[in-house]
């Protein structure tokens, strides 16, 4: 696990986040393209999703598109999976959302940035996947990139409904949303368990222990409140009885990102060394949840 944490690359995170937020071009389908918006209703979100798919394919991770319908329109989530070595039927799910808004989520927004919200979680999950693949863990780790989050958690509700209906059991659900803004000393990171809903506090304890065990440079805070209830993609899973938490930067106090849902949510306004630490903590947690010794 230590080697996996040391492999987290600030440069790779920076490069991908610059591409994913349209600051620089990305290569998708062999063509250089610059995305202008990740609005749920903008065609460029499709390019962004293809970028995610190609990143997984390039590192040899199985990935698929999972369509769902809202109001007669078809949208897609992206699902990547790293099979467990001994107990592949046990599944740990990590998630982030690929869509973004600059303040008018119901409009077809011509321009969004969404570096922190939730480019950070998206690119963080790609980095996590690379580490998890190398670790060869006993349990399966599945990574979801949801869409329609800014319209009311469309993609994650659809996906959680689908797997519950199929009788899929999950060890745990960890949503990573907004992990790249920290303007105060101390590197505070919040973990939300909706006040131990479905026994989710056990995951909070594991998160704290992982940070301490690997000397990760973060100050974790167990928010122990209902501030993010139904505001994050973990909501649908909690509704169905799964254990689940949200990992985020300081979300409910005075350290909140002032660029939230504006065109100012850009890479230059993010704290990427802080994000690296949160990604490391997420990898350490994933390893623990997926049966690492």
What residues fall within each predicted segment?
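N-terminal capping segment at the start of a domain
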Residues: 1-44, 215, 255-266
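Structural recognition of the beta-strand scaffold that forms the well-ordered cores
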Residues: 12-21, 64-66, 77-81, 91-96, ...
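Extracellular/periplasmic catalytic domains that process cell-envelope and extracellular macromolecules
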Residues: 7-13, 57, 71-74, 83-89, ...
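Extracytoplasmic/secreted proteins, especially bacterial periplasmic and envelope-associated proteins
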Residues: 3, 12-19, 43-60, 120-127, ...
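Solvent-exposed loop/turn segments at secondary-structure junctions
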Residues: 26-27, 62, 68-73, 84-87, ...
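Acidic/histidine-rich catalytic neighborhood of metal-dependent amide-processing enzymes
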Residues: 74-77, 108-199, 230
